[in-house]
Amino acid sequence: MYPHLVSLGISEPEKIERYSLRQEAHKDILKIYFSKQKGELFAKSVKFKYPRQVKNVLVDSGSHRYKETTEINRNLTLIIDELNKITRPEKETPTDVKKKILKDLRHLEKVVASKIEEIEKDLEKL
């Protein structure tokens, strides 16, 4: 019933609770969260990275100028379609979008802080 999710190794798609999708550099990061099982402290999740497809788009036909742009991987769109059938996400309001952007910003801050700390430790070793 969900061939693309099964191809990812998800044997029980009905246990999917929600998912998130974000873009980092030239990759889309899909994270799938499963329903928390009895006795588990945290709900299980899996993460997948998909490279964005690079396309050259004609900007000006007179000068034959092209612009490089990226778009979501076709396989990822098929997976998202299946995930939407399972999770039936609600439409996002402008407030939801603002919260998502702030959440992504906080996540980026943590990633950068962690990387800075890692580099500083490497410097101390020298």
From Swiss-Prot:
Pfam families: DUF3461
Family to which the UniProt record says this protein belongs: Belongs to the UPF0325 family.
Name used for this protein in its record: UPF0325 protein VF_1965
Organism of origin: Aliivibrio fischeri (strain ATCC 700601 / ES114) (Vibrio fischeri)
